[in-house]
Design a protein with these regions (language model features):
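N-terminal topogenic membrane-targeting module
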Residues: 25-93, 98-99
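Feature marks short, highly hydrophobic, charge-poor N-terminal signal-anchor/signal peptide-like helices
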Residues: 1-12
Length: 289
């Protein structure tokens, strides 16, 4: 009798384990669909939140921190300051920053990163970041990415504060860590794939972007292999030599905002596509007194 009870109990456990595995797989599939729907709704919510914030400004203390740290601040035209500050406020209110190590000046970091990420979309909807769940801030080394200064997936950004702090004041070097990683985020947003095409495959601009990426990939390869200086930083060439193209949009974005005049001169098609996408014209930005 005891053996029969034991066998029945064992059979029940096996059945429950099987049932759990089967249903957990189903849940994961359903969860991904639900997550996408939630993110789309989040996009609507973010745009509404930005609309409610319209007219709000950063405090003098916050503005001073941005002026003292972000090199691009002195170049941004006055007519973009209001929408830039509104997006910065909305960003800080709606996105989660995670201090991955103790001792970081996290409030200052939040303001600086939010400000640069918001400059990227100063003329675009904040729903571009609808899939973003968290921004992880590390002192120096990013866990599992020892050689990287920053990483991006569709849902998460990782940034090294030591590197960011050292380089953020350089407004014309063509490489901006925050803009670079958040450009990846925008690239991921429409289809979950980073292929340097920031629009949906259903967009009327998709084929034009596709051709541009292929053509620019070839140009960047030739420049890199020939050791030539180029408006789009060599990192894009280094990645491209392996056949990868995700870095073209992110490196191109950094060049667009920080080397606008040169990019327009050397790669007019790239510049015009970026100008149309971002809605700004950095080639005509002039430093303010």
């Amino acid at each position: 009798m005891e053996i029969e009870i034991l066998l029945i109990a064992l059979g029940s456990v096996v059945f429950l384990v099987f049932l759990y595995r089967a249903t957990s797989n189903i849940t994961k599939v359903k969860g991904s669909k639900v997550e996408n729907k939630i993110d789309e709704r989040k996009g609507e919510y973010l745009n509404q939140a930005l609309e409610r914030i319209k007219g709000q400004k950063l405090s003098e203390e916050q503005r001073e921190i941005i002026q003292n740290h972000i090199g691009l601040y002195q170049w941004v035209p006055n007519h973009l300051i209001a929408p830039w500050e509104e997006r910065t406020i909305a960003f800080m209110e709606n996105f989660t920053f995670c201090e991955m190590e103790k001792g970081l000046p996290i409030e200052k970091i939040e303001l600086i990163v939010a400000s640069e990420a918001s400059l990227l979309i100063v003329q675009r909807p904040i729903s571009d970041y609808r899939h973003l769940h968290r921004i992880n801030i590390w002192k120096e080394v990013i866990k599992n990415h020892k050689e990287a200064r920053g990483t991006a997936t569709r849902n998460e950004i990782n940034l090294s504060w030591n590197y960011l702090e050292k380089t953020i004041g350089q407004a014309r070097d063509g490489h901006n860590l925050t803009l670079h990683e958040f450009a990846h985020l925008i690239d991921f947003a429409d289809d979950g794939i980073a292929q340097s095409i920031p629009v949906s495959s259903y967009s009327e601009d998709f084929k034009e972007w596709q051709k541009l990426v292929n053509d620019e990939h070839e140009r960047l390869m030739k420049a890199y292999e020939g050791g030539k200086n180029y408006s789009i930083r060599a990192y894009g060439g280094y990645e491209s030599i392996k056949g990868d193209k995700p870095e073209l949009f992110s490196c191109g974005t950094s060049a667009f905002f920080e080397r606008g005049s040169r990019l327009k001169r050397e790669c007019p098609k790239v510049y015009l596509m970026m100008q149309d996408f971002y809605g700004v014209d950095p080639a005509n930005w002039r430093i303010k007194d």
